[in-house]
A protein has these predicted regions:
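N-terminal accessory segments that position/regulate proteins before the catalytic core
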Residues: 1-189, 194, 207, 226, ...
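Short pre-catalytic strand/loop immediately N-terminal to key active-site residues, enriched for Gly-Thr
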Residues: 197-206
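Structured binding elements
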Residues: 222
């Protein structure tokens, strides 16, 4: 489907928007030397969870009742898993994870919605899968794009074809043990043509909602999921062959067993 005049204007407008470009580019820095300190060497402030309280004001105690609602159980057991074993995922495991994290659902009345919220239903977030270990002969290691409309993984190329060393994509050695690294990118103009500069917040909100869905789905399976911010954006964008004037890496989540 071709792009309309409004979309072409939005693309041009984003490419010329120095403020948004500068904000996104500044966030690409990964502070590896500091954040990779062993826990024993962490500053004390890193070990403390801070809360905001209005202790001089009256408060109302909120009840928490027992519930058998599935979502309550999933949120209570949600966790970040980092102990990967290089075991490959099945197509069914990947398919279900994507369907219930960011897939599309058609209702009996013909209406369509996705598993995650998106401001104005603009859906600027795209998902790519960098598969390292697979238990299916139908899923070769390499780079894929998730086609939401067809619920398929489109095989783009092997992860060595672009000349990018796969070991340089992440800042942490343990991240290389994950079966799949799912990369969330932003096609900025899709939201900007409706929400202008405010769109950057909405795009980040959408990516967060999507990854939380992945966490919740994994809570009911034997999969391990962890949101991962230590990606080397430039290397990943090179691997995905993105035109970074239009589409850039936001974040990633790792999945394995």
């Amino acid at each position: 489907m071709g792009l309309g005049e409004d979309s072409l204007w939005s693309i041009s407008n984003f490419m010329e928007n120095d403020a948004l470009q500068s904000l996104h580019n500044a966030s690409k820095k990964v502070y590896k030397p500091v954040t990779q300190l062993p826990p024993a060497y962490w500053p004390e402030d890193w070990k403390v969870t801070h809360y905001k309280e209005y202790t001089r004001f009256p408060s109302v105690t909120l009840p928490v009742s027992d519930t058998k609602a599935m979502i309550a159980q999933l949120t209570a057991t949600r966790s970040s898993g980092r102990s990967f074993s290089r075991r490959g995922l099945t197509l069914e495991e990947i398919g279900n994870l994507l369907k219930y994290s960011c897939g599309e659902f058609t209702h009996s009345d013909g209406s369509v919605h996705r598993a995650h919220a998106s401001a104005g239903a603009r859906y600027p977030v795209e998902i790519y899968a960098i598969v390292r270990f697979s238990s299916s002969s139908d899923l070769l290691p390499g780079v894929y794009h998730y086609n939401v409309k067809e619920h398929t993984l489109e095989y783009l190329w092997s992860d060595t074809r672009t000349g990018v060393d796969p070991n340089t994509l992440v800042a942490d050695q343990w991240a290389l043990e994950a079966s799949v690294m799912f990369v969330a990118t932003a096609v900025f103009w899709r939201s900007q043509n409706k929400y202008a500069d405010r769109s950057y917040r909405y795009i980040c909100m959408e990516a967060g909602a999507l990854i939380q869905n992945a966490y919740l789905y994994a809570s009911d399976t034997d999969l391990q999921v962890v949101g991962y911010g230590g990606v080397n954006d430039d290397k990943v964008e090179q691997l995905l062959r993105l035109d970074t004037r239009l589409e850039s890496v936001l974040c990633a989540f790792l999945v394995g067993k």
